[in-house]
């Protein structure tokens, strides 16, 4: 058995168009012999969507995927009644359009692409993944210097997967890009939302505020889910706690 799991997420789809999860073990045999320093541990992908480096199209992705998505932490949740789920927390792009470039001073509904990259890749897309009209492929005036992937709106979300789907991936009966969340929870109403106004140019504001959630942890014995809200106490995070019911 592989008792540990790890993963990563990078905006732009470099690590896959959705969260990634790999199962592994830190020992090399049935006796529990630790791996030697520098050993490459074998890992089994449980969740791995298509990479943007392999496909320019939004395919084999998380449903509703956008390039500005941010998935920062994940946990295996088990309730007192024995129900289980794999939960990821992050800041999800949910806007009608998303683009590579800058925040547009005219408003979140207006893209502001980096003109230098127009023609190199699809710098602006609609929510369904199709390209934006040509009228959106212009760099606005008066923007700041914080270039990256932006959506016209973000939401702080938990997404929950059925562990049975991930087990099917490990068994080879599902492809690693096939599992999808069975539930999505928007938790923005519980957040402080950068009350000190730290790094507005970097973080965005209002509907375009990203970097909302950070790492997560789960207290299995007491059913407590701990989630970091980033930039909630000036530059420091605040820990939110949810009681998971059975």
Task: Give the residues covered by each predicted segment.
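Sequence/structural signature of beta-propeller domains
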Residues: 1-246
